[in-house]
């Protein structure tokens, strides 16, 4: 399984590659889009101006492509807003053509109407080598949906955050059986920003002024009659307490599920990191690389989980914010 990490500026490319990323993805918002639509109609799912979360100029695209040629770690570009208005589609296609001119061929898309527009109005892009990754911001993912989306010549499915491992395995095995001539790639979320919703039904803003909802701490549990959440007692602190903000996977972690994800047929692992501190993302990439190395050298799932936790969580306390329920 390959590590796919998000970057927010070209300065992050080399550190993330050296940390162990196999692929990278980013957003690109050119000035023409910002001037006309601002952040009210975002080009991707980061409605942000004031910190590094987007590539913003053609020159940056050109510089980053030189890095890709040097390090051979590809970059895909996200056009993954949940929807666009009709007048925007022609501009989006123009931006995609511009990206392809500089060597970028892979785009992450969530809006079904954009896929329809591309197929009907810009079929030449596929002839030029365009690849489509179906975003984790797309709505429900099931076998019938995958059959329908094959009409748009997708190359990869990014499962959304609420797909169970058994669901993924069922869909992947079905696709392999029904389409042996054209195998897809399959990507699953593995670290950070475990959304309270699924991406398609998240209508919060990922912007400068408001905290991301996926980073607002919360706790699930039963509340006794007559008790309010603010009166609930917090868990007793461990004798070897860690700083939660520095813990791997504090906002979402699927490391324990790597064994089952591999069995299910997952080929790529998404590390959510656009806009995060560079040092934090490098730590996360290294931790995931360590977990994958342990996975390759253990004989069974309990052995893997035990070894991984001892290596990455030496105090014995992980975040407990699990992406997947592993039983």
Regions found by a protein language model. Give the residues of each.
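A cross-taxonomic marker for long C-terminal extensions/tails that follow the last structured domain
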Residues: 147-157
């Amino acid at each position: 399984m390959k590590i796919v990490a998000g970057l927010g500026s070209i300065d992050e490319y080399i550190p993330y590659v050296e940390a162990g990323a196999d692929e990278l993805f980013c957003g690109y918002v050119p000035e023409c889009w910002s001037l006309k639509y601002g952040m009210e109609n975002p080009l991707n799912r980061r409605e942000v101006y004031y910190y590094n979360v987007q590539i913003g100029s053609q020159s940056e695209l050109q510089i980053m492509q030189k890095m890709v040629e040097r390090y051979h770690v590809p970059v895909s570009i996200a056009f993954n807003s949940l929807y666009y208005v009709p007048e925007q589609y022609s501009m989006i296609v123009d931006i995609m053509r511009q990206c392809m001119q500089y060597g970028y061929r892979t785009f992450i898309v969530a809006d079904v109407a954009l896929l329809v527009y591309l197929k009907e109005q810009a079929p030449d892009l596929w002839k030029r080598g365009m690849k489509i990754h179906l975003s984790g911001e797309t709505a429900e993912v099931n076998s019938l949906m995958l059959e329908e989306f094959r009409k748009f010549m997708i190359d990869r499915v990014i499962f959304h955050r609420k797909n169970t491992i058994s669901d993924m395995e069922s869909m992947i095995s079905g696709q392999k059986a029904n389409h042996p001539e054209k195998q897809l790639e399959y990507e699953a979320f593995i670290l950070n920003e475990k959304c309270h919703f699924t991406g398609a039904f998240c209508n919060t803003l990922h912007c400068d002024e408001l905290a991301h909802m996926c980073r607002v701490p919360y706790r699930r549990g039963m509340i006794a009659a007559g008790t309010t959440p603010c009166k609930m007692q917090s868990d007793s602190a461990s004798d070897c307490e860690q700083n939660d903000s520095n813990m791997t996977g504090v906002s979402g972690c699927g490391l324990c599920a790597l064994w089952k994800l591999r069995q299910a047929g997952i080929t790529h692992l998404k590390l959510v990191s656009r806009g995060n501190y560079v040092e934090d993302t490098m730590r996360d990439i290294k931790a995931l690389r360590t977990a994958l190395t342990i996975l390759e050298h253990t004989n069974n799932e309990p052995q893997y989980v035990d070894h991984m936790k001892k290596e990455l969580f030496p105090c014995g306390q992980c975040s407990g914010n699990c992406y997947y329920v592993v039983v």
